[in-house]
Design a protein with these regions (language model features):
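Acidic, Ser/Thr/Pro-rich beta/coil linker or hinge segments at domain junctions
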Residues: 3-10, 285-324
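Active-site glycine-rich loop that binds ribose-phosphate moieties when present
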Residues: 134-146, 184-206
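Active-site-proximal betaalpha loop/short-helix elements
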Residues: 89-91, 190-266
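Glycine-rich anion-binding loops of enzyme active sites
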Residues: 40-53, 78-175, 296
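Small-aliphatic-rich amphipathic alpha-helix that forms the alpha element of a beta-alpha
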Residues: 57-82, 102-110, 198-208, 224-228
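Helix N-cap motif at beta-to-alpha junctions
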Residues: 273-279
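Extreme N-terminal cap/leader segments of soluble proteins
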Residues: 1-56, 75, 84, 106-108, ...
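General beta-strand structural signal in soluble alpha/beta enzymes
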Residues: 28-31, 47-49, 114-118, 157-159, ...
Length: 324
């Protein structure tokens, strides 16, 4: 098999055939596009998610904390703590592990969450450092937002700019290559995108405004996230390429490496659906967060309108990052 997430058909089969015993306390179960599980504990819900970092070589501690917190943010609740598993290859020094944990601890402190535990080992089973985290959030019972809540007629809103994470990974891990076509200022700008990977603020605001659906845009990029949201909600969508916010340095990098920015890992951006999406856009912009309405939730299939031509969006394959 090639690197990357399993295709949706294989993943759905694995999920559907291996659910174990379904507990009544679990109010949001596993499914395509659902990154979180929700467990009811009376007046409050516990929201849990887990994700590894596998495609990056640098800033993996910072990335691991943010992508997991973003899953919780997409439910519109507050992250409380994180558990960290580190698998280090043979030859890793104690100083390298300490530096990684320091990065994780500093990012967790910045986001007001606690590192509650985990596991660390050196193993021949991996050839580079792997970090996998489980994040726990808390919200009032019945208030969490699901990926599967999108409704026909909803506006589709995205926050910040697409492929911030993918752009920063490429520049940090392949700096010598990008120096051939990027200026020093562009390289500094792209590296700085790691400071914009959290979607906690927009997730909290969107939850307060009563949106129908949220999904953080990660592996597979915007088109992958749209497809997953539509599949989970049993709806279609129609989005317009010219309305999708993408930084010029990202366009330049993707053009040079022949990558599609709409299929490139995009932590730092949230996909949201609701009625009167411009109301959310205005509220986000008042807090200094870029946002745009890029289309509508529809019946039928998912459509990308590109230069006036309609293209049906297929199920997501592996992320463009793995095509480098």
């Amino acid at each position: 098999m090639k690197p990357g997430k399993l295709n949706w058909e294989d993943l759905k089969e694995l999920i559907d055939e291996n659910r174990g015993f379904q507990r009544e306390e679990v109010v949001l179960h596993s499914g395509i596009g659902e990154d979180c599980a929700v467990i009811n504990f009376g007046d409050y819900d516990c929201v849990i998610s887990t994700d590894p970092i596998t495609g990056a070589g640098k800033n993996i501690g910072k990335l691991a904390v943010n992508i997991n917190c973003n899953d919780i943010a997409s439910s519109g609740v507050e992250p409380i703590g994180i558990m960290v598993t580190i698998l280090a290859p043979e030859g890793t020094t104690l100083e390298e592990i300490k530096a990684l944990m320091q990065e994780i601890g500093e990012e967790a402190a910045r986001l007001n969450i606690e590192v509650m535990g985990g596991h660390t080992e050196v193993t021949s089973a991996v050839n580079k450092m792997i970090v996998s985290c489980t994040i726990i959030g808390k919200g009032k019972a019945g208030t969490s937002v699901a990926t599967s809540g999108a409704k026909v007629g909803d506006d589709i809103v995205v926050t910040k700019f697409m492929a911030l994470e993918g752009t920063s990974i490429i520049v940090n891990d392949h700096e010598q290559k990008v120096q051939e076509f990027l200026t020093e200022a562009e390289i500094i700008e792209a590296k700085g995108f790691t400071d914009y990977l959290s979607v906690l603020e927009e997730g909290k605001l969107a939850g307060e405004l009563g949106v129908n659906s949220m999904h953080d845009i990660t592996e597979g990029g915007l088109l992958g996230a749209l497809w997953e949201m539509a599949k989970a909600s049993q709806v279609g969508f129609r989005v317009f390429e010219e309305k999708i916010p993408i930084k010029e340095v990202t366009k330049k990098i993707c053009s040079s490496f022949n990558l599609d920015p709409l299929k490139l890992i995009s932590s730092g951006s949230m996909l949201i659906t609701m009625q009167q999406g411009e109301r959310l856009v205005k509220a986000l912009q008042q807090k200094g967060i870029n946002a745009a309405v890029i289309g509508k939730i529809t019946e039928g299939s998912g459509i990308l309108v590109k230069e006036g031509v309609e293209q049906e969006v297929p199920p997501p394959q592996r992320d463009e990052l793995f095509n480098l």
